[in-house]
């Protein structure tokens, strides 16, 4: 039997690859291949960058409420792979900081600018 293990990440718990490896441990008969997948959310840039044989770059930008942070994006040939959540995601904020009237996606723009340089 051949099996394809394609599991999305479990937000805040397992990456797609980690989930696939856990499932592979339970697969004892036949051949299995792990293919990381993403619905376009958390982990998307990592999966796409690695699938394209790209590299990662880290840049200083600002989180949704203006604090300086370091965020990572992918580069594959002349294509930048930027995940909005890296600079503008809710996961960067504490619960008491969640306020759409004060949040900004400026940091994502900073990542785009860094990629263009």
Regions found by a protein language model. Name each.
Residues 1-117:
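N-terminal loops that bind phosphate or other acidic moieties
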């Amino acid at each position: 039997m051949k099996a394809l293990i394609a599991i999305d990440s479990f937000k805040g718990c397992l990456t797609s690859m980690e989930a696939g490896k856990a499932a592979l441990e339970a697969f004892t008969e036949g051949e299995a291949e792990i293919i990381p997948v993403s619905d376009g959310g958390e982990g998307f840039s990592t999966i796409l960058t690695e699938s394209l044989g790209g590299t990662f770059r880290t840049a200083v930008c600002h989180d949704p409420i203006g604090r300086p942070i370091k965020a990572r994006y992918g580069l594959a040939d002349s294509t930048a792979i930027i995940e909005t959540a890296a600079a503008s995601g809710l996961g960067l904020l504490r619960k008491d900081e969640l306020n759409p009237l004060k949040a900004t996606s400026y940091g994502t723009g900073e990542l785009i600018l860094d990629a263009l340089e």
